[in-house]
């Protein structure tokens, strides 16, 4: 792009209304309104914000979690739906925003970032390519057809979710599309010291992403609340695991430095920063891993962006409805039933 705008970005740190689609959609719209009123042009939301992250997968076995999975399934986002209509209305604040949802497509669930533009259009989505560990009991896989970067008046916008930032091939694929502003959607930072899901580890991965791909990262995370604990914790051990707070939202510049206002780990709020896309250029001079600093002669990545469907339908079904009247009174010779 020939234009390198300066503008304000925002990263949300908040708790959803766990397993309540309508209430969390309403909260999402209020947060978009708030960020837009404070001048943000691009707004990031945490991983699995609508209708909340399935924390029970880390708290107990499948029998314990099934009742919550059923609630999640019934409160997931379908496209199209009234939920998407409401989110689209929030886009009329003349902002871009990216919100991570549990999407229901057919009979399966997927972890999906939805992108809305200033007209309220749903311009695309990114499904998490591979659910992490116990998440595989909830969400199916994405593919390369849903790994977009959008060319906009505010630069090239893209996003990944949680541990997707730890995978070098994901990072390289995003670099190949010349992303400039990145939404890094995370759940919370596990409070247990040394945990691989801890805030230090997640922030380190996001800072590496910012430096490696020369992008501004809008890191957005949830927080744990007493309401969430009351919703799904059935034992004292579970409550002790799910401690209140542990958000770590922040905005990271292409040099890995944190910019903007800071939020306490147990504080709901929005962190803002004023960014200048021209600051990306020095990094491109030094690195550009998908360009002059690459070594395609012996190291390269094949990035397949075609849609991968588990079942391919060939031809069209010939099924027709034969009415009661046709069955009872019609010419039997003309009545055909297709199996």
UniProtKB/Swiss-Prot annotation:
Q: Where is the CN hydrolase domain?
A: 7-277
State the source organism's domain of life: Bacteria
EC class of the enzyme, as a word: hydrolase
Q: Which residues form the active site?
A: 47, 128, 162
Q: Which keywords does the record carry? A: Hydrolase
Q: Which GO terms describe its molecular function?
A: nitrilase activity
Query: What EC identifiers does the entry list?
Result: 3.5.5.1
Which InterPro entries does the UniProt record give? Answer: C-N_Hydrolase, C-N_Hydrolase_sf, Nitrilase/CN_hydratase_CS, Nitrilases_CHs
Give yes or no: UniProt keyword Transmembrane. Answer: no
PROSITE patterns hit by this protein: CN_HYDROLASE (PS50263), NITRIL_CHT_1 (PS00920)
The reaction(s) annotated as catalysed by this protein in its Swiss-Prot or TrEMBL entry are: a nitrile + 2 H2O = a carboxylate + NH4(+)
Please name the SUPFAM superfamilies in this protein's record: Carbon-nitrogen hydrolase
Cross-referenced Pfam families, in alphabetical order?
A: CN_hydrolase
Q: Which family does it belong to?
A: Belongs to the carbon-nitrogen hydrolase superfamily. Nitrilase family.
Xref: PANTHER family: CN HYDROLASE DOMAIN-CONTAINING PROTEIN, NITRILASE
Output this protein's name: Nitrilase
Native organism is Bacillus sp. (strain OxB-1)
């Amino acid at each position: 792009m020939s234009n390198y705008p300066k503008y304000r970005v925002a990263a949300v740190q908040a708790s959803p209304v766990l397993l309540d689609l309508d209430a969390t959609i309403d909260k999402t719209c209020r947060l978009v309104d708030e960020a837009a009123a404070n001048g943000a042009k691009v707004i990031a939301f945490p991983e699995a914000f609508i209708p909340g992250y399935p924390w029970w997968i880390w708290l107990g076995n499948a029998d314990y979690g099934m009742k919550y999975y059923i609630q999640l399934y019934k409160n997931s986002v379908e496209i199209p739906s009234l939920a998407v209509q409401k989110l689209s209305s929030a886009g009329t604040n003349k902002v871009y925003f990216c919100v991570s949802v549990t999407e229901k497509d057919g009979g399966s669930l997927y972890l999906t970032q939805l992108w809305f533009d200033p007209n309220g259009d749903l311009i695309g989505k990114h499904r998490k390519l591979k659910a992490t560990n116990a998440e595989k009991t909830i969400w199916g896989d994405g593919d390369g057809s849903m790994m977009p970067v959008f060319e906009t008046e505010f630069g090239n916008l893209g996003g990944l979710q949680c541990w997707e930032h730890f995978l070098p091939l994901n990072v390289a694929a995003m670099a190949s599309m010349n992303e400039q502003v990145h939404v890094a959607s995370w759940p919370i930072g596990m409070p247990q010291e040394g945990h691989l899901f801890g805030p230090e580890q997640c922030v380190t991965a996001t800072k590496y992403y910012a430096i490696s791909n020369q992008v501004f990262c809008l890191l957005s995370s949830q927080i744990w609340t007493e309401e969430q604990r009351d919703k799904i914790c059935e034992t004292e051990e579970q409550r002790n695991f799910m401690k209140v707070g542990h958000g770590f939202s922040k905005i990271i510049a292409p040099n890995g430095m944190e910019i903007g206002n800071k939020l306490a780990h147990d504080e709901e709020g929005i962190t803002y920063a004023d960014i200048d896309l021209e600051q990306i250029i020095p990094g491109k001079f030094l690195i550009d891993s998908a360009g002059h600093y690459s070594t395609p002669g012996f190291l390269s990545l094949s990035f397949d962006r075609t849609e991968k469907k588990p079942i391919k339908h060939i031809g069209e079904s010939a099924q027709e409805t034969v009415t009661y009247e046709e069955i009872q009174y019609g010419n039997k010779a003309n009545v055909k039933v297709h199996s």
